[in-house]
């Protein structure tokens, strides 16, 4: 018969046969190593771009993260984006623009679309909050957007 409240000396209260102080101190180096290797704050925030009616099947994402120097690292990725020459009217290239609040758009570079209709542009910017949009242009070094916006997004860092 078992009495309640009585201790059983043959039953161990711990699953490890070592004292608690040794067991917990052995965990500290492992926890510290995980903290150094874990990518805290290194993951990118992703924003989905909205397609224009001219390219309804196009998809785009903007991935942003803060770099080591405090600037914003930006990766613009597109899928199923038609070649600019297939648009009406046909154009030569796509240009990615960043527009901070109360400022004019800045040309961040040409977005090249491959034969699989995928595109990517990686760049760095000093902005936290800005609009991202892609236009079809006659040339890549234009100072201001002239072509139609094909994908747009708002980045609120």
What residues fall within each predicted segment?
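Bacterial N-terminal signal peptides
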Residues: 28-37
């Amino acid at each position: 018969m078992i009495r309640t409240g009585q201790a059983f000396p043959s039953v161990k209260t711990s699953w490890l046969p070592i004292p608690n102080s040794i067991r917990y101190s052995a965990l500290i180096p492992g926890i510290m190593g995980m903290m150094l290797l874990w990518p805290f704050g290194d993951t990118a925030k992703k924003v989905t771009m909205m397609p224009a009616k001219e390219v309804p099947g196009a998809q785009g994402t903007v991935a942003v993260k803060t770099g080591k120097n405090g600037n914003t690292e930006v990766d613009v990725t597109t899928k199923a984006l038609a070649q600019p020459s297939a648009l009406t009217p046909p154009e030569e290239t796509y240009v990615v623009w960043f527009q901070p609040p109360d400022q004019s758009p800045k040309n961040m570079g040409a977005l090249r679309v491959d034969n699989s209709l995928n595109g990517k542009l990686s760049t760095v910017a000093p902005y936290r909050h800005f609009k991202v949009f892609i236009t079809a242009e006659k040339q890549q070094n234009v100072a201001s957007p002239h072509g139609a916006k094909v994908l747009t997004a708002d980045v609120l860092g």
